[in-house]
């Protein structure tokens, strides 16, 4: 098993963890229906970038 040779400082630990934060989901409002959806994803009623792409 690997064992560290020297103790990592709080600063180095914090620098490593600085990239671990989660970002919030990017939301957009659809131009045609006004529905809120995730960016680069089809809305629930089948629109993407103002065009109907899924027929239900």
Curated annotation (Swiss-Prot):
Top-level taxon of origin: Bacteria
Pfam families the record matches: Ribosomal_L32p (PF01783)
GO BP terms in the entry: translation
Xref: InterPro entries: Ribosomal_bL32, Ribosomal_bL32_bact, Ribosomal_zn-bd
Entry GO MF terms: structural constituent of ribosome
GO cellular component, one term: large ribosomal subunit
Chain intervals for the UniProt region annotation (Disordered): 1-26
Residue spans of biased composition, Basic residues class: 7-16
Keywords of this entry: Ribonucleoprotein, Ribosomal protein
Family per record: Belongs to the bacterial ribosomal protein bL32 family.
Protein name: Large ribosomal subunit protein bL32
Originating organism: Shewanella baltica (strain OS155 / ATCC BAA-1091)
Gene: rpmF
């Amino acid at each position: 098993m690997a064992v560290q040779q020297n103790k990592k400082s709080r600063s180095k630990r914090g620098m490593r963890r600085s990239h671990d934060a989660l970002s919030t989901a990017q939301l957009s409002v659809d131009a045609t229906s006004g529905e809120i959806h995730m960016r680069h994803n089809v809305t629930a009623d089948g629109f993407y970038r103002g065009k109907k792409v899924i027929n239900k």
